[in-house]
Amino acid sequence: VEVVNVELKIRNILTQGPTVEVPAKVDTGATLLVLPQSVVRELGFPTIRKQTVKYANEERADREIVYGVELEVCDRRGVFEAVVEPEKTYAALLGAVVMETLDLIVEPRDFRIYPNPRSKLPMAEIE
């Protein structure tokens, strides 16, 4: 099975810090945005709670949830919470919450995502 990969622009909206580009896997079966601990530390996102998460293999673990993650992808932008994953083998995981909020569609034939052309969401202007 092929994987859809994207580049995310992420910054801490609470500190108005720098924007970093982070590669991510798009996972329509995942619910939340997941970031590696290294990115969370680099950008200084605050932990707002701990939450039990369930993985695809049915394992459960307690993970920190951070806030203030401003994320831009496909010229769409929003602020999200993210699960902190201490030992990730990939940079980030883009789940359904971000996809739905930003009204993005997965194109499985081309292995990409794009904004819903019928969306009523405004497009972000990129300078």
Show which residues each predicted segment covers.
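Pepsin/retropepsin-fold aspartyl endopeptidases
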Residues: 1-127
